[in-house]
């Protein structure tokens, strides 16, 4: 089948693997419309449809025969381990460690063979499947626990009636998300198949329980995803982080290199925006992602989102930027790691955060560049929080007063610094190796480290105390300081893809 894609790959300047992947994502749109036309009272047909489409992706389209057998092995091991050990406390941990260990093994193989990110192989689908299988194991365990011991999420997602093998295969191979996500929980999949998710008061399609508005939102996501893809195809080939390690880049002035890094970072992100937005749209067409109705009765479909590009490109601060990236992975880390490693009756602490971060790092891959990016992320979140706590109160308007020019300027500078730091710290994530990552940072003059570490140094050698005393002298109320600082971040809003922030481990002197 490669012969069909070679001319197109040559025309757009992409690899054959990339073209085949995008083709699978686009094929999912008409197939999503077919899926919803299978009667919901015939769930077996819907499960078989999911399985059949995924087999079509893996075999004739992508040629991932060995890779699929590995995925199938993980699926069957998870299913039977959960089925015959559902009441064992060890079961979810066994599945978690086995599935994550298998993924890490394949990540190492990818490093050994030096496969580029353009090569489509098993680790991409396996990362999604890892989230689904490990979440399922915990959901089954929650279904055997006393409901009084469960929180709201655990109670809603718990699996109390163990599924048939066909149902589980349909879930694991749910076709819109089988290659690159989005991930979803088993209860959500079953509710989708039986159309239990949808309730009045909105309009419905063709007498079915499926709310109207699904196609409008889904195809809008497709257009948006294709637009991002177009940007990447046109500009990404010559504007990416790999240019930073070329002799030409070293010959440019420092200011030009910094400006080019902003362009490279933006272009690199567009491919993720494209893929995740395309899969979100296809998922919506099957009915996944429904989040209710507006007061006017219009349906909303935000539950399948994995990224919010506008928030990332125009962030109010670094935290909201992180919260809007790879959102499904953050939910998985929170529900399947962070909450689970904390003993009952105790509050999560430093080690809970560190082990959750380590899981995130292992899940992403074995390349050194990933770890450089993630480790730096912990310092960035700390510096950003301290800046917000110490600087923001000076710019907040009095209660009941309109936003001032100074506050708008503060927000603009904060967004600009967030993007500058993001495009700096993300470069190792794409350059991958230690040598290339250090070369890239060196040619940028280590400006991200200067900004972040310089800020932390300021706050830790007396800057925090100075700002607090100045706030008191200016009569800034404690209420305004609390408003600027924010309350302790709820578990549901924590970011788990970076290590614990320094200020949470060793607070600066005040």
Question: What are these language model-derived features?
Answer:
Residues 1-510:
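Non-catalytic, membrane-anchoring transmembrane segments at the edges
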């Amino acid at each position: 089948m490669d012969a069909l894609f070679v001319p197109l790959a040559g025309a757009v300047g992409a690899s054959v693997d990339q073209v085949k992947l995008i083709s699978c994502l686009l094929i999912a749109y008409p197939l999503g419309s077919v899926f919803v036309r299978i009667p919901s009272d015939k769930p077996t047909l819907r499960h078989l449809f999911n399985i059949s489409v995924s087999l079509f992706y893996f075999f004739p389209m992508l040629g991932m025969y060995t890779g699929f057998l590995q995925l199938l092995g993980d699926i069957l091991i998870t299913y039977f381990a959960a089925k015959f050990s559902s009441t064992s406390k060890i079961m979810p941990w066994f599945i978690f460690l086995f599935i994550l260990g298998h993924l890490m093994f394949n990540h190492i193989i990818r490093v050994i063979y030096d496969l580029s990110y353009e090569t489509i192989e098993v680790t991409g689908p396996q990362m999604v499947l890892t989230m689904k299988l490990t979440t399922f194991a915990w959901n089954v365990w929650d279904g055997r626990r006393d409901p009084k011991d469960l929180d709201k999420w655990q109670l809603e997602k718990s699996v109390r009636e163990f599924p048939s093998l066909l149902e589980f295969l349909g879930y694991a191979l749910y076709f819109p998300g089988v290659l690159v996500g989005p991930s979803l929980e088993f209860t959500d999949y079953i509710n989708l198949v039986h159309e239990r998710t949808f309730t009045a008061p909105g309009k419905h399609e063709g007498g079915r329980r499926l709310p109207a508005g699904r196609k409008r939102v889904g195809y809008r996501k497709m257009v948006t995803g294709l637009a991002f893809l177009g940007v990447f195809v046109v500009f990404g080939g010559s504007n990416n982080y790999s240019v930073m390690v070329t002799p030409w880049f070293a010959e440019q002035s420092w200011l030009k290199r910094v400006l080019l890094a902003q362009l490279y970072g933006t272009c690199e992100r567009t491919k993720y925006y494209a893929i995740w937005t395309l899969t979100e749209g296809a998922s919506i067409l099957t009915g996944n992602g429904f989040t209710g109705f507006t007061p006017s009765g219009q349906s909303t479909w935000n539950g399948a989102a994995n990224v919010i590009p506008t928030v990332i490109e125009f962030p109010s601060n670094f935290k909201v930027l992180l919260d809007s990236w790879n959102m499904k992975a953050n939910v998985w880390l929170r529900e399947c790691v962070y909450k689970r490693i904390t003993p009952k009756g105790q509050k999560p602490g430093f080690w809970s955060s560190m082990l959750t971060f380590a899981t995130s790092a292992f899940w992403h891959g074995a390349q050194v560049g990933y770890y450089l990016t993630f480790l730096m992320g912990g310092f960035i979140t700390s510096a950003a929080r301290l800046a917000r706590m110490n600087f923001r109160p000076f710019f907040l308007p009095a209660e009941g007063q309109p936003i001032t020019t100074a506050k708008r300027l503060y927000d603009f500078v904060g967004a600009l610094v967030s993007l500058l730091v993001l495009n700096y710290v993300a470069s190792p994530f794409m350059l991958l190796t230690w040598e290339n990552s250090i070369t890239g940072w060196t040619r940028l003059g280590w400006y991200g480290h200067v900004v972040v570490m310089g800020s932390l140094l300021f706050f830790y050698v007396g800057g925090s105390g100075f700002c607090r005393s100045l706030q008191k002298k200016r009569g800034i109320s404690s209420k305004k300081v609390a408003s600027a600082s924010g309350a302790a971040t709820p578990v549901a809003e924590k970011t788990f893809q970076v290590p614990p922030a320094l200020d949470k481990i060793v607070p600066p002197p005040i």
